[in-house]
């Protein structure tokens, strides 16, 4: 059975034991968000800004949850401070599932500057990340990176660029 890109992301989250997700609306992640929202085993909290989501997820982690945030990479720029301070200083794990806009094939020019900067921002913040090219790679990457996040108490990111969808 062929698994589509959204199903693979959702399956990766389930495989990884993610039981708490926050999200910011994103057209590329729409189907994944619908799957997460329909799953009673995953508490899903939609938020209006990424920084709010990271705060909610930090509290969920402290309550014993395995957390993820689903967001666009434009929100990564908004979240540098919370990642560099709260998450890094207090060793809070989280899996970031990021719709990576602004990469090759992007139709919206306004997305390109942040698209170019995303990998550099993650490297500067010392956040491990992967850019899977297929549904199978995405599912595997989410599991492996979530394991790294939980073992090291660090944020990790899965970047899903335009070609992934």
From Swiss-Prot:
It comes from the Archaea. Pathway: Cofactor biosynthesis; coenzyme M biosynthesis; sulfoacetaldehyde from phosphoenolpyruvate and sulfite: step 4/4. One of its GO terms (molecular function) is thiamine pyrophosphate binding. Its EC number is 4.1.1.79. It catalyses: 3-sulfopyruvate + H(+) = sulfoacetaldehyde + CO2. InterPro entries: Sulfopyruvate_deCO2ase_alpha, THDP-binding, Thiamin_PyroP_enz_TPP-bd_dom, TPP_dependent_decarboxylase. Signal peptide: none annotated. Keywords: Coenzyme M biosynthesis, Decarboxylase, Lyase. GO terms for biological process: coenzyme M biosynthetic process. Heterododecamer composed of 6 subunits alpha and 6 subunits beta. Belongs to the ComD family. Involved in the biosynthesis of the coenzyme M (2-mercaptoethanesulfonic acid). Catalyzes the decarboxylation of sulfopyruvate to sulfoacetaldehyde. This is Sulfopyruvate decarboxylase subunit alpha. It comes from Methanothermobacter thermautotrophicus (strain ATCC 29096 / DSM 1053 / JCM 10044 / NBRC 100330 / Delta H).
């Amino acid at each position: 059975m062929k698994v589509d890109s959204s199903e693979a992301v959702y399956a990766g989250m389930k495989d990884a034991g993610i039981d708490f997700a926050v999200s910011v609306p994103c057209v590329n992640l729409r189907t994944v968000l619908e799957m997460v929202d329909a799953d009673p085993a995953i508490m899903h909290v939609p938020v209006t800004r990424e920084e709010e989501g990271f705060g909610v997820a930090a509290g969920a982690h402290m309550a014993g949850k395995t957390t993820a945030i689903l967001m666009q990479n434009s929100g990564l720029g908004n979240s540098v401070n919370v990642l560099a301070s709260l998450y890094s200083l207090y060793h809070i794990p989280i899996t970031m599932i990021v719709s990576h806009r602004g990469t090759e094939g992007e139709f919206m020019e306004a997305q390109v500057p942040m698209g170019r900067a995303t990998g550099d921002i993650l490297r500067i913040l010392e956040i491990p990340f992967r850019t899977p090219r297929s549904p199978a790679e995405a599912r595997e990457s989410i599991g492996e990176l979530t394991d790294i996040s939980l073992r090291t108490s660090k944020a990790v990111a899965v970047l899903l660029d335009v070609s992934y969808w």
